[in-house]
Amino acid sequence: MPSFDVVSEVDLMEVENAFNQARKEIAQRFDFKGTHTELERDKEQNVLIRAGSEGRAEAALQVLMEKLAKRGVALESLDPQKLEPASGGHVRQLVKLKRGLKVEDARKIVAKVKESGIKVQAAIQGEAVRVTGKKRDDLQAAIHAIRAAGFPIPLQFQNFRE
């Protein structure tokens, strides 16, 4: 029976490349000179922006988002937190990376597939939703229904099997 998986993943190599490009651009750009603006990464692949002012932090976030978009990383996978004051009159902002399909989102996807009326079954399997059906056309209709729902997270469709 044909099936596919709905997942929400981020290519960490592309994130790493975009992060390095953004860091390099911030170090070389004239308007960032002397502003003590820097980007750091932690073990969870989150990005920490440190800057001398709110405007520089927002500009650094824009540079990072631009580089991620050019590398093909969905910007919906970013979760920028609020700007918070740091020592020495600086500000910092944590930008979290959304990875994996949360249970609430998986339930919404299953509900959307069921309410579409297509003859397929959707089941939650860990951090993925497996959709199975008798015909390939039904699965493609399910993919279109999920995309049309406009979920606020980046979704990929993998393991399309006959």
From Swiss-Prot:
Cellular component per GO, a single term: cytosol
Any one GO molecular-function label of the UniProt entry: nucleotide binding
Residues spanning the signal sequence: none
Keywords for this protein: Nucleotide-binding
Family annotation (InterPro entries): DUF520, UPF0234-like_C, UPF0234_N, YajQ-like_sf
Gene3D superfamilies: 3.30.70.860, YajQ-like, domain 2
Domain of life from the UniProt record: Bacteria
Entry function: Nucleotide-binding protein.
Family: Belongs to the YajQ family.
Protein name stated in the entry: Nucleotide-binding protein Adeh_0094
Natural source organism: Anaeromyxobacter dehalogenans (strain 2CP-C)
